[in-house]
Amino acid sequence: MRYLLSAPSQIKATIQLPASKSISNRALIIHALSKGDDVLSNLSDCDDTQVMIKALTEGNEVIDILAAGTAMRFLTAYLSSTPGIHTITGTERMQQRPIQILVNALRELGAHIEYVRNEGFPPLRIEGRELTGSEITLKGNVSSQYISALLMIGPVLKNGLQLRLTGEIVSRPYINLTLQLMKDFGASASWTSDQSILVDPQPYHCLPFTVESDWSAASYWYQIAALSPQANIELTGLFRHSYQGDSRGAEVFARLGVATEYTETGIRLKKNGTCVERLDEDFVDIPDLAQTFVVTCALLNVPFRFTGLQSLKIKETDRIEALKTEMKKLGYILHDKNDSILSWDGERVEQQACPVIKTYEDHRMAMAFAPAAIHYPTIQIDEPQVVSKSYPGYWNDLRKAGFGIKVGEE
């Protein structure tokens, strides 16, 4: 299936954003480890979170997390530290995504994990047990989800957890998000130095908890505001002092002409008429926003150099290669370096007359390219249903904002 998109001349809309996937998934693991009955409110309705809920509530011996990378990592640690024998698997792409770093770390803590097929990759057979805990050292540039997975089981380890990180730490805001949520549920967990985190063996307390809206989802509406001739967009459920690192996107979009006004119910986006001539930005802390800014800058004719993209190679797809391929269809030649830098210096080629954007089973590819319809009225998005991974209501929300969406020809 493909969607053929058309954009209105001006955007005026009020959008209820989905709940934060990052907070929902962490809260579910922590809540399960607390073994309480209090309610988690406003959980995300995205695929990733629904997979997590199913795994935690049904207790099946074989757990299929489909394409949910967060669930694979968080559940691997959770299942290792709780009694029971399970096999955890996923899609073909999920079985190609490495997990050896996390498995090795869990084995150091005493976990019993076996690879079912290929060494270093899912599926995994896990015999859960009480883990002793110890000091672990990891490179700081590994996926922050590995680090968060280990941290969240820290309070239930017999001796707690001392986690030392070496070198540059990637996605530090996601680590801080995990620590803040752990503290909200009664854990004693904190940085003891710039490179070390201590988690005491102190049980979680179960309590009612409400999940805030998703700043990652908000980024696509900032993008729409930036690309539109006129825009007045209200997004509910977002706050100035957010746990989410992706809230920094508001600061970066301010340089691309989008002003943020905080209201009692959320935020209001308006164009402020000023845009930088070039954007150089480090995305090491906000990698999930990279695709959005690549498309936005190119369409605004703003050359850019984005660094800190090393984690994009092991996401739902190789996002660096995907961006280079799909942006070329729109007439832009991107260059990458060292698997961590992506840039555009203004180089153009002839665009395709009717570009069809491949999404590579990646929700963020679909949502980052859909707003390009504002500049490309013939653009089509292939496999649009992939947005259900994080923002199931995305296409309906675009319709509310005045976008036309038709099923295109294959």
From Swiss-Prot:
UniProt keyword Transcription regulation present: no
Pathway: Metabolic intermediate biosynthesis; chorismate biosynthesis; chorismate from D-erythrose 4-phosphate and phosphoenolpyruvate: step 6/7
Reaction(s) this enzyme catalyzes, per UniProt: 3-phosphoshikimate + phosphoenolpyruvate = 5-O-(1-carboxyvinyl)-3-phosphoshikimate + phosphate
One GO CC term, this protein: cytoplasm
Keyword Transferase tagged: yes
Alphabetical list of PROSITE patterns matching this protein: EPSP_SYNTHASE_2
Subcellular location: Cytoplasm
EC number: 2.5.1.19
InterPro entries with a match to the protein in the record: Enolpyruvate_Tfrase_dom (IPR001986), Enolpyruvate_Tfrase_sf (IPR036968), EPSP_synthase (IPR006264), EPSP_synthase_CS (IPR023193), RNA3'P_cycl/enolpyr_Trfase_a/b (IPR013792)
Ranges in coiled-coil conformation: none
Top class in the EC scheme: transferase
Residues the record lists as binding phosphoenolpyruvate: K21, G69, R97, Q145, R319, R364, K389
Gene3D superfamilies referenced in this protein's UniProt entry, alphabetically: Enolpyruvate transferase domain (3.65.10.10)
Catalytic residues identified in the record: D288 (proton acceptor)
Domain of life, source organism: Bacteria
Family of the protein in this entry: Belongs to the EPSP synthase family.
Subunit structure: Monomer.
Protein function: Catalyzes the transfer of the enolpyruvyl moiety of phosphoenolpyruvate (PEP) to the 5-hydroxyl of shikimate-3-phosphate (S3P) to produce enolpyruvyl shikimate-3-phosphate and inorganic phosphate.
Protein name according to UniProt: 3-phosphoshikimate 1-carboxyvinyltransferase
